[in-house]
A protein has these predicted regions:
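Beta->alpha turn/N-cap motifs
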Residues: 40, 67-69, 79, 83-93, ...
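A conserved helix-loop-strand patch within extracytoplasmic ligand-binding domains
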Residues: 106-155
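Periplasmic-binding protein-like
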Residues: 107-118, 143-150, 207-271
Length: 271
């Protein structure tokens, strides 16, 4: 009996020791962080943040790549990663509403802005009464475009329309503009259409024909845009030291320069 007791005691002590080791391994390392990013050209931007974090703050950043926009928030919510950097606020808000995630933004990165482009005019003063203005037809980017047209004074929308207004929400149109909704990939080609005076195009499609917001846009979203991209973490992790260090590293001149290089001058600081 005594032998059995000693054996059980030894096993219990061993299990207890292993449990303690396990707890130690699960503790968060303030000098290490796993960050979810989207694979592709834009991955080059957090790669620079990774280097800045190591050089300036002694933080080891492990980048975890994803091929779509759904999995990074799912992985973050489950605790598989500590933060992610890929989405703007309207998208995050919709994810929180649809999926009930307990996630929070802890820092801004960049606005990759939509802008107004034209081959017919060089300023809004030249925009004639009754001109046709092309905008993307998907709900998110249509709303984004209409809000930008309102911001520059071309139209006025109903109060309280939020981030998804439609042309039915236009209540003032002093130049009697004709808003033409097109598939987003068609917008760059619409600039050659004799009937289109102006097109609102996002950075991805504008860059395909060599246009950049800062250089070629007649008007451009600014850093106050609700579409600024974010660094996001879990609510219970928002004050973690490794998260704070990563935000500081991302919001650096080195990362800003990298973003502008990758997006041909199309990145606007969001901080």
């Amino acid at each position: 009996m005594a032998f059995k007791f000693k054996t059980f005691a030894a096993v219990g002590a061993l299990i207890g020791s292993l449990a303690l080791v396990g707890c130690g391994q699960d503790e968060k390392d303030p000098n290490h962080i796993k960050v979810g990013v989207i694979v592709g050209a834009e991955q080059q931007v957090p790669e620079v943040a990774q280097k800045v974090a190591k050089d300036k703050y002694g933080l080891d950043v492990e980048l975890v790549t994803f091929n779509d926009y759904v999995l990074p928030n799912e992985a973050l919510s489950k605790g598989d990663i500590d933060a992610n950097a890929f989405q703007h606020k309207p998208y995050l808000d919709q994810q929180l509403k649809d999926r009930g995630y307990k996630l929070v933004a802890v820092g801004n990165t960049f606005v990759y802005p939509i802008a107004g482009y034209s081959k017919k005019i060089k300023s809004l003063d030249e925009l004639q009464d009754g001109s046709q203005v092309a905008v993307p037809n998907d709900p998110t980017n249509l709303g984004r475009s209409l809000l930008l047209l309102q911001k520059v004074g071309l139209i006025k929308l109903k109060d309280g329309v939020g981030l998804l207004p439609t042309v039915l929400d236009v209540v003032e149109n002093p130049k009697n503009l004709k808003i033409v909704e097109l598939e987003a990939p068609q917008l760059p080609r619409s600039l050659d259409d004799a009937q289109i005076a102006l097109a609102v195009i996002n950075t991805t499609y504008a860059s395909q024909i060599g246009l950049t917001p800062a250089k070629d846009g007649i008007f451009v979203e600014d850093k106050e845009s609700p579409y600024v991209n974010l660094i996001v973490t879990r609510e219970d992790n928002k004050d973690a030291e490794n998260v704070k260090k990563f935000v500081q590293a991302y919001q650096s001149d080195e990362v800003y320069e990298a973003a502008n290089k990758v997006f041909n001058g199309g990145a606007v600081k969001g901080w």
